[in-house]
Amino acid sequence: MLIKVLANEFLLSASSNTTVNNAVVVRVVHTGTQEHVITIGDGAGSNIGSFTMLNNSELILEKDRTDTLQVDSGTDVKVVSIAYKN
């Protein structure tokens, strides 16, 4: 997979939601040793869903521009807006 980085990577916060620079595609990297729950919300503040991010893993997440991400705890999940192609 080829990715194009569209912004600076930053830590996903447990205290606030982020659209990840209004991203449609997000690279999510978890560098810690414990699993975390990532919650996806809509622009109105309602939860769309959540998933468990395994420790020492990475994934590519597709979302709507106004959807937000938040981690349950910790400072070891990083996100960045990207474009990609297979």
Language model regions located:
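Surface-exposed, low-hydrophobicity beta-strand/loop segments enriched in small/polar/acidic residues
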Residues: M1-N86
